[in-house]
Each structure stands twice: as C-alpha cells, then as structure tokens.
Amino acid sequence: MSILNKISNFIGKTFSLWAALFAGIAFFAPDTFKWVGPYIPWLLGIIMFGMGLTLKPSDFDILFKRPKAVIIGVIAQFAIMPATAYLLAKLLNLPAEIAVGVILVGCCPGGTASNVMTYLARGNVALSVAVTSVSTLISPLLTPAIFLMLAGEMLEIQAGSMLMSIVKMVLFPIVLGLIVHKVLGNKTEKLTDALPLVSVAAIVLIIGAVVGASKGKIIESGLLIFTVVVLHNGIGYLLGFFAAKWTGLPYDAQKTLAIEVGMQNSGLGAALAAAHFAAAPVVAVPSALFSVWHNISGSLLATYWAAKASKHKKP
C-alpha cells in the first residue's frame, strides 16, 4: 500500500473529526473559508467525478438479479427522507428558511459514505452501491420535483434551474468519470487511491464555507437545527430498516437500507442551497450539519451491527 493510499484511507476513516474541526474553525473564524463559496459546485463535481471513476458495470448486476431490493431502497430513499423532513418542519414550526434547508437535504439522494458504513456494518455492499448509484442518477428529476412539491409554499423555488444544476454538478461529472475509467482502465487506480482524501477535502471545505457564511443564524438557531438533523437522520435509519423488514428483505438488506435511507448526499444539499438560496445562507446549514452528524451516527450504528455480527459468530 502506497503512502498516498495510507494517508487517503486514514483521512477517509476519520472524516467526522475533520468535518467537526473545519466547522469549528469556520464558526470561530468565519472569513477563513469565505473564498470557497463560489467554488462549492466545482467541489461537489469533483466528488461526483470520483464516484463515476469507481463505478463498474458489475455494480449494477444486483439491479437485474435482485431488482426488488434496489427498487424498495430507491423508493424508501425518496419517500421517507423528504416526508420526514416536511413533517418535522411542520411539527416543530420551523422558520421558513430552516424548514426549506431541512427539506432540501431530505430530497437529496443517498450519500456515498453509506457504502463504507454498510461494509463496516456487514450489510450488503452491492445493494448499497446500487441504491446509491440509482438514486443519484435519477436525482436530477426527483430531487427538484419533490422539493418543489414540499417546500414550494415556503420560498420561491425554480425547479427547472435546480434540475440543470444537478445535471451539471452530479450527472455530468459521474458520466465523465465513467468515460475516463472506460478509456484509461487500470491506469485510474492511482487516482482512485486518492479519492477519499480528495472527497474529504472537498466536503470539509463546503462545510467550512456554509458554517462561516451562517455564523449569526447558527448562534441564533444552531441547537434547533442540530436537533432536527439528529431526529431526521435517526428516523431515516429506523424507517429504512423497517421498510426493508416489512417488505420481506433479509437482515443484511435491512441493515443496508437503514444506512442508505438515513445517510444523505448532504454535499449536494449544501451546493444547491448555495447556488439557489444565496440570499439566505442559513438554508445550507442543515446540509452542513447533516454532513458532520450522519458520519458520526453512521459510524456508531455500523460499529454496533459489526459487534453484534461478531458476537453471533462466536461458538
């Protein structure tokens, strides 16, 4: 294993610590990451390019072998998290800008970190990759449509413009990554070795930019937003697990869909908020806090399931 690979793996495994550190720096020195703001869409594009670079045709085999599990996962992703976000916003009577931010992250597809957490939890990694990939590829259509339906009454939303943003920031970079992988083949291995490092660097810069731009609102409403994020994430895990259980999927798929549903592509949420709600930077805060929290909670949940699996294997 190369030094770059070792460093990259270490950074990837300690992501939550780096996210919390950069959020703290941005809070106490908000101008530190001010320069990052205009580059948020590009940073997300780099992350999505990395996702495309690692995808293989075999990653979609499960879509044909076990379509039921993938379909249930994708439906659960785009039903549970948006609905939960909307209900939390209404039940807690959240201010419009915060409510829109919570709903926005709820309407995003699953996050790529869910694949790692599924592996650690001894879930079905192939299913995790397929659900993440499919939900991401159809997000240009579903994310703006569901977001408009649930949050259109709260703030003015340009769904068509948002669709184009997702195509540019998500779909195009993924397709480009697939093409590069197809053309270069094994030569992309050195690039993929650095992906955890590059992805973590990109997302912590996005977090820093969002937190720095919203310091005032975080002081005013940070505890409320964090509480909603924790509830949103936790309910996602719970309902994702039972969605798989109630539809007769095996235990490894139940763990997988719990993680898939509960963990969001919060980087996309932050990028969309920065691009379409620049006048209300607090809209991006739920996504930024989600980025920090879901990696902590996902690690804890994966560790619990891994320990449980090890215990059951002992004679």
Each model region followed by its residue ranges:
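Alpha-helical transmembrane segments of multi-pass small-molecule/ion transporters
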Residues: 1-315
